[in-house]
Amino acid sequence: MRENGFPAPKFSTTIPKGDDRARAVCDHCGFIDYQNPKIVVGSVALWKEKILLCRRAIEPRKGFWTLPAGYLELGESVEEGARRAAWEEARARINIDRLLAVYSVPRISQVQLMFRATLESENIDAGPESAEVDLFDWDGVPWADIAFPTVGWALRQWRESRGFTEFPPYSNPVEGL
């Protein structure tokens, strides 16, 4: 018994009726603790054709460059989450243009949504998870030091979508993960 008078939950792993995979199920009340993918939201944000990148100050891939992105919080829209991530990582205010891509990263149970965006100003500064932030023209992107495959995909797909106002969202390239 816990201090609040409720029994401490005890879970067993079983396949619930009508399901096709093992889940953690409460032995007392039958509650099913579904483990679902995490949603990551971010942006390819520009200031006058220069791309905002953040050098990671944390693991994984500390010291490598990434786009401003982060986990979606409860109660946020995906657009709100992308704006918050840009602020937290680069102290950048962004205007979302449109959805650029949706990536599936099953090996780490993530779904990533990347937006095309513009910076409201060139005033940027490293947030607590960034060692530094900078604006890069296309030829100056530090390709050898990009943190994750999805960052490279988003950058290339942003470039491919330039000049288009309507296009279906991109997804994982054929080579996948």
Q: PLM features: what roles do these ranges have?
A:
Residues 2-42:
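Acidic, metal-coordinating catalytic segment for phosphate/diphosphate chemistry
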Residues 1-6, 173-177:
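Short, low-complexity, intrinsically disordered N-terminal peptides in bacterial proteins
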Residues 21, 36-40, 46, 60-62, ...:
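Short connector loops at helix/strand junctions that flank enzyme active sites
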Residues 38, 56, 146:
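Surface loops and adjacent helix of pleckstrin homology
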Residues 31, 49-50, 92:
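Well-ordered beta-strand scaffold positions
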